């Protein structure tokens, strides 16, 4: 970048850099440079292919994966609990969270594990003792943290969505090619579930075919329903809470309780709304195995209670996919907002529930849930007919759940189930939906 001689001097391969900068200097340059500046014109990696500063450590099955966690409260605490079940495979090496209010904080139950407010300081001081990173932060922080982790050769488990906009999703796909030995798993945990494998087998068997319409919905109440904010609220942060790190170089907004503790999902600038939160759990099998991770050719939106700052009170987003791969054109409709369910299929009475999907196949309709739950045909008669004819494939049992799958992949036992190659196109679909919710129209 003009005016930054360190960055200008650093625009070179790591081998060349070693002549001018120590590896430690390079480490600091990577950590304290926003990724968008690293890859932009004049940036650290503007000239093409990137290699990690450190190669990922080879971890044998009899060795534990030394894991740091960024974002340890709220969802982070739940994820820690899930990984802790596999104590024979994981060792928690460090924790980082802007909400560690005391300089020498510790996490209950993990006394002795170093804690940091700033994840960059954690990497700077402990990168040699870390093999993998769990990222359970607000959506806007996922991308820079994933990039920094990958450039340091650390395997990554990152909560969904993988990133918050289309540019970030596409750059991470490049990163996956540049850093092929770095394992990344997006945390749509149902992608390792039984229902996902079942849907895959139904597609392979030709059971799900000639689909022309898919409806998906999440119509539970959300945090922002009923909000009427037309400006960012303002309050004083708790003493010790590092608001600057939380913002992650986004334009300054004042601290408010309406931005933290999960409320960030409500705001365009920091979250991805209901679609980013639940779409990854409802659409993952459909997008991966029927739509073949394709992106839509056209998007239209109908909004209920639109806002300039927060997600609408409800929406219907229609993604149109052209005919491809020998399959007809498909219309995927996403519904959110209280009571904003799709119409029920012909002959179906009663409430569809607040979460689910309907896949309109050639001869029947398939009902899905979320988080890797099992699919079923709405017609019991058709189900019996297919089962009696031996045309209803058996559902494979997953060899591991999503969390252990990540640890297994780090140890070379099995491939990861939701790598960037799968997760980024899904995240991009969700981000495109969020763009539609923000701006409306087609």
Language-model features and meaning:
Residues 13-34:
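N-terminal secretory signal peptides and thylakoid transit peptides that target proteins
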Residues 33-110, 286:
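N-terminal Rossmann-like dinucleotide-binding module
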Residues 71, 75-76, 178-185, 190-300, ...:
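Predominantly a Rossmann-like dinucleotide-binding segment in NAD(P)-dependent oxidoreductases
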Residues 30-39, 52, 78, 254-259, ...:
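C-terminal helical cap and adjacent loop that interface with cofactors, partners, or active-site loops
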Residues 138-139, 143-191, 206:
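Beta-strand-loop-alpha-helix segment that lines the small-molecule cofactor/substrate pocket
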Residues 114-130, 135:
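A structured beta-alpha segment of the ubiquitous adenosine-cofactor-binding alpha/beta core
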Residues 93, 131, 212:
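Conserved acidic residues
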């Amino acid at each position: 970048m003009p005016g930054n001689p360190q960055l200008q001097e650093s625009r070179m391969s790591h081998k060349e850099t070693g002549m001018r900068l120590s590896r430690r200097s390079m480490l600091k340059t990577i950590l304290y440079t926003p990724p968008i500046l690293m890859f932009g014109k004049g940036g650290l990696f503007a000239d093409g292919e990137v290699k990690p500063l450190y190669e990922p450590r080879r971890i044998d099955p009899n060795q534990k994966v030394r894991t740091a966690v960024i974002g340890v409260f709220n969802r982070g605490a739940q994820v820690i609990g899930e990984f802790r079940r596999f104590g024979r495979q994981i060792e928690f090496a460090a924790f980082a969270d802007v909400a560690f209010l005391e300089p020498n904080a510790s996490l209950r139950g993990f006394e002795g594990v170093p804690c940091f407010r700033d994840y960059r300081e954690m990497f700077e001081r402990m990168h040699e003792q870390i093999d993998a990173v769990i990222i359970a932060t607000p959506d806007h922080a996922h991308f820079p943290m994933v990039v920094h982790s990958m450039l340091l050769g650390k395997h990554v488990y990152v909560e969904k969505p993988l990133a918050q906009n289309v540019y970030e999703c596409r750059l991470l796909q490049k990163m996956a090619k540049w850093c092929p030995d770095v394992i990344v798993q997006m945390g749509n945990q149902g992608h390792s579930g039984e229902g996902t494998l079942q849907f895959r087998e139904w597609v392979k068997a030709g059971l799900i075919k000639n689909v022309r319409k898919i409806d998906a919905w999440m119509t539970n109440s959300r945090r922002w329903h009923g909000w009427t904010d037309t400006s960012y609220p303002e309050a004083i942060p708790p003493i010790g809470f590092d608001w600057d790190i939380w913002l992650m170089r986004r334009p300054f907004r004042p601290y408010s309780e309406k931005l933290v503790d999960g409320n960030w999902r409500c705001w365009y600038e920091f979250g991805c709304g209901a679609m980013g939160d639940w779409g990854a759990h409802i659409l993952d099998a459909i997008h991966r195995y029927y739509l073949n991770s394709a992106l839509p050719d056209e998007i239209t939106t109908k909004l209920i209670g639109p806002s300039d700052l927060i997600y609408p009170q409800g929406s219907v987003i229609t993604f149109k996919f052209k005919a491809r791969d020998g399959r007809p054109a498909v219309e995927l409709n996403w519904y959110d907002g209280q009571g904003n369910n799709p119409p029920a299929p012909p002959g179906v009475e009663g409430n569809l529930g607040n979460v689910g999907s309907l896949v309109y196949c050639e001869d029947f309709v398939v009902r899905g849930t979320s988080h890797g739950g099992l699919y079923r045909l709405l017609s019991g008669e058709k189900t019996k007919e297919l089962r009696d004819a031996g045309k209803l494939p058996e559902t494979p049992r997953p060899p591991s759940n999503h969390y252990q799958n990540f640890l297994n992949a780090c140890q070379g036992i099995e491939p990861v189930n939701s790598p960037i190659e799968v997760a980024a196109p899904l995240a991009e679909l969700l981000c495109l939906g969020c763009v539609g919710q923000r701006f409306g129209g087609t």
